[in-house]
Amino acid sequence: MKTQSLISMGLLPILSVNAAYTWPSKYDELEDILYLQAGYRRYGFRDGVTPCGFSADGSNRETAAEWIKTAYHDMATHDVETGLGGLDASIAYELGRAENPGSAFNGTFGFTNNYASIKSSNSDLLAMSVVVASMACGGPIIPFRAGRIDAVQAGVPGVPQPDQDLATHTAIFAKQGFNTTEMITMVACGHVLGGVHGVDFPQITGDNNETSFPHFNSQYDNFTNSIVTEYLEDKSIDVLVVGKNDTFNSDKRIFGADNNKTMTSLADPSNFQAQCRDIFARMIDTVPASVTLSEVITPIEVKPTELSLALGANNTLSFTGSIRVRTTHRNADNVTVSLRYRDRNNNLSNTTISTERGRWQLGQSYGFAREVFTFYEFDTAFDVTSSISSFDVIIHTAGEADEINTNNGLGFPVSDAILLQAPQSCQPQIIVNEAGQWNLTITAAVRADRVGEPVAFDWVYKRFIQGVMINQLEVQRTVMEKASEEIGGYYLYTATKPIDTVQWSTTFDLVLGEGDNVSKLEFLSTGNLASTCQPFP
């Protein structure tokens, strides 16, 4: 089968395509954030660490190093005996502790907050920041899993400090689940990038100036093993190795904990990359025992995006969207895409929906490891009496047999029970009450045979916590009321909710029914709504 032959062409093992993927997945948003780094549709997560030595806060900072540091400090409170702690974003509540000095942590959350949502937790984004920082700096490709759950309060203290002795450090790492070899590897890999901030550790650098930033090694902005080779050759510039006050030379004590056996093995560049990949994967996958992580998130071959089915004029349903095709191993110039679809009663249509490749930036997005994705867009209409229930994606490559993607035999589902009427929904930026709030109006079309069932939209409220950079997300339900007579087999429902202006850009779900008979449209954006609601045609 053609799909199998394409999979066999894969990149590195952890970037191989997951044939078991079924759309939609609750991790679709995270997959997009990780793989759509540039181009036609981009999330740009790598922007914060490109080039590797970059920091928006100036030359005495290195964001890539800070992302890795934040993830480690967050994970460091894990206890293998109790199963408590781990990578859970609890560090956002722990910044008043002496073990977490400096602005690196809030700086990290200041960036990842831009991507946090009900589908992408802060802790998953912290894990992803390690993956992206490593790749942006020429380091190993670290497998990324999802499913972390954000803490809502501080965890126990336990981050190792530079003035602690080797026995204490060994015990702390053992509590986290790492043996002596792994402790050495973690510190060596974690100190490839960046250095020590004098403003946070003047007792180490001897200079409390903001610009004091002695680096761990001479290649601090490139993921190499110079931290190892310089140490073994007695050429180290690491102030945690050659500092004037030996009490704070924690790297020296840790690196030599097994008489340099581990450091000597890490002098081989290939082994260094492999060991850093594995130890960073262990680090970001160290989570509370109550959390179950997903399989490794790999690039998806065929993925619908931004699908919209809406009630239109003259008893029609407008159907728009795009199909994202992984063209890393395909020549997109030779590819065309069409959809074969099934009507509301699951009857296969004898016509197909054509698509057109996106024009801007050739319709292509790019990711790490030379990943390429090409978008094919469509805009069509159905009669309301026939509608659509699912579709398959047909990929035609010139000179080859067609490849039909059936979403593992299920078809790509499209529900026509409840529809977002985007033109009739809006968010006027006009203050409507003494609290300084705006109105958010959501309008949906509900199929006539489902009228009488409860209709609502579930809106994600961002709760701001003083002194904490991340928000706690709460789902609030707003009941919608019928607002029209029957229109082509549908009724319009609407609701208006006053919201604080800082909540203007969030997400919501449309919900029809209850119990076992619920239809949903999920992860819709308020930020995409116009400022004026239009009347229905």
Annotated model-derived regions:
Residues 18-537:
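Catalytic cores of secreted/periplasmic or lumenal enzymes
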Residues 1-22:
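Fungal secretory targeting signals
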